[in-house]
Amino acid sequence: MADRWDVSEELARLAAHIAKFRQTAGGGESEGRKLDFLIQEMNREVNTMGSKVGDAEFRWGVVEAKSCLERIREQIQNVE
């Protein structure tokens, strides 16, 4: 059961995706497709964490994170 609640791997991957997103977004070129892919990967990690953790408060955090990621995705599509 403890492994099911352990989201340390997902958090590490999410942090790596965020770092790459910042690096890519800071570049001068239009990297919309790369950014969109990174958002997709971040969303996947957030979904996995949501399915692993049963805590209601944590799940509301997952919903908020997914909402933020969707808003970022919309902004990326507007720039493309």
Could you say what each language-model-derived stretch is?
Residues M1-E80:
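N-terminal intrinsically disordered, cationic/polar leader segments
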